[in-house]
């Protein structure tokens, strides 16, 4: 079971009700969330992702309950293997291999939700140093799903947790391409190397 539990009781809004609200977007929050229903470069819906999600995102089921179970399923059914994938690997291939790193887990979950016309965004940040989490002391990625009547619910399928104080959000977007830590073109001769170290500690 995923831990920790949400601080507040989650609404019983069903998957169908969430789709309808996103389509009609009757308020500013659902309107802002609507852009995260659509495919993006690294997190697009696909038939196999839709089929995978159908087992969990069932008609009449509360969406919040369903996305928590979906995150747990990905955590259990996919293997965390550093350097087993690259950002250029198609999402369908990542899904077929059932292995990867945090950005792959996040893209798979986002792709599943978008296949069901639900809003999900990619969150980039860091984990608290010393925590017994996969991906600690390096950049990390997780998912945020839009729950009408609640807002955005963060889920970390890599570690099967609901992110709280141990997760430090830096940015969010449609997928990794929106929040890359380094982007651009470098011109000139000579070799280059980037060396980065990160340590996250509580502020007392």
Describe the residue ranges of each PLM region.
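Short intrinsically disordered coil segments
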Residues: 9-19, 157-161, 185-187
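Hydrophobic/aromatic-rich core segments of domains that either
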Residues: 72, 104-186
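Secondary-structure boundary elements
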Residues: 4, 16-100, 108, 174-176, ...
């Amino acid at each position: 079971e995923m831990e920790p539990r949400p601080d507040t009781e989650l609404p019983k809004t069903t998957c169908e009700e969430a789709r309808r609200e996103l389509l009609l977007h009757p308020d500013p929050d659902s309107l802002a969330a609507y852009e995260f229903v659509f495919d993006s470069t690294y997190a697009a819906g696909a038939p196999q992702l839709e089929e995978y999600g159908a087992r969990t995102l069932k008609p009449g089921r509360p969406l919040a309950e369903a996305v928590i179970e979906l995150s747990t399923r990905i955590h259990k059914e996919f293997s965390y293997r550093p350097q087993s994938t690259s950002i250029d690997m198609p999402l369908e291939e990542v899904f077929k291999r059932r292995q990867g790193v945090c950005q792959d887990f996040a893209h798979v979950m986002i792709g599943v939700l978008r296949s069901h016309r639900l809003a999900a965004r990619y969150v980039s940040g860091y984990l608290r140093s010393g925590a017994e989490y996969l991906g600690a002391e390096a950049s990390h990625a997780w998912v945020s799903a839009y729950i009408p009547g609640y807002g955005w619910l963060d889920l970390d399928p890599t570690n099967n947790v609901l992110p709280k104080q141990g997760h430090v959000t830096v940015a969010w977007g449609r997928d990794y391409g929106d929040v890359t830590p380094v982007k651009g073109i470098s011109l000139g001769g000579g070799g280059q190397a980037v060396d980065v170290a990160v340590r996250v500690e509580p502020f007392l």
